[in-house]
Structure formats: C-alpha cells, structure tokens
Amino acid sequence: MNEEYSLQDLLGQESELQFAFFNNQTAWKLGCQLKKIAEDNSTLVAIEVYAFSQTLFSYAMSGTQLDNQIWIKRKRQTVLRFGHSSYYIGQYNKAKNREFEQQVHINADDYCAHGGAFPIRIKKCGLVGVVTVSGLPQREDHQMVIDALTDLIKSVQKS
C-alpha cells in the first residue's frame, strides 16, 4: 500500500495495538519477530525495543550503520516525549504545514518525526516503552513495526 495513513488510522493503530502485559520476555519476542520479518524480506534494518527506561532488545543487521542507531534514538525520544508514533507526529506536522524539526522547542539532534518508532502501551496502564526500526523509507519502517506488533499481540492473546 503506497497511500499515506490518515491521522485517524495512525491513532487507531495506537489504540488497538496495546498489550495486556509487557515484560522483558515480550520485548525479546517482539525484537525477534522484527528480525524475522526483516530477514524474510531481505531488508537491512536496525531494531530496538526500549521499555522500563532500558534497552531490552537491540539488533543491527549486517549492512546497517551507526547512523541507524542515531535515527533510532531520535525516533524513540520523539515517542517518549509526545506519546505518539513518530510517523503520526510527522504526518500531524505535515497536515499543519510545518516542519517538526524546525520548531523552536525541538532540538533536531534529539528528536525527529520520521516513521519507525511506535509506543508500547499496556492496556489500562499507559506508555511503558517504544519499539523502533530504522533503515527503510519511513512508511516501511512504520509498517514493519505494525506488522510485528499485530502478529505478536494476536499470538499473546491466544495463549
């Protein structure tokens, strides 16, 4: 699908893709699911699952660079600060005809509004972390995260 998600679609993803529980083992499964998706599609990405103020999973595929880690940090910080996916923040600012990184209160060295980072939320609890992918065009980074979360949440609900 090449068309952009609407802001409502992106908010719907955030509302729908929440965990009943999340722990270190869940983070590991999520990271491994992302790695498998990347390998199955022969894509080169860096992956991070960050929760409870620590990195619980980090993997950089052969062929990625330090720059991917810098993008991961900036995307993660955006989600932690604003509570929405980095893709939503970018699309929201695009709809407002403004550049996120050029706003006075934003340091572009610390934050970016490019897709690939998504909030990890526990139902009835709130934001506990961020899952991030870097290495593809932003919509594809975002979609990879959505696909992994969808698969993992479905499998957790069945067990």
Swiss-Prot record:
It comes from the Bacteria. InterPro entries: PduO/GlcC-like, PduO/GlcC-like_sf, YBR137W-like. It holds the Pfam family HbpS-like. Coiled coil: none annotated. Disulfide bonds: none annotated. Belongs to the UPF0303 family. This is UPF0303 protein Ping_1243.
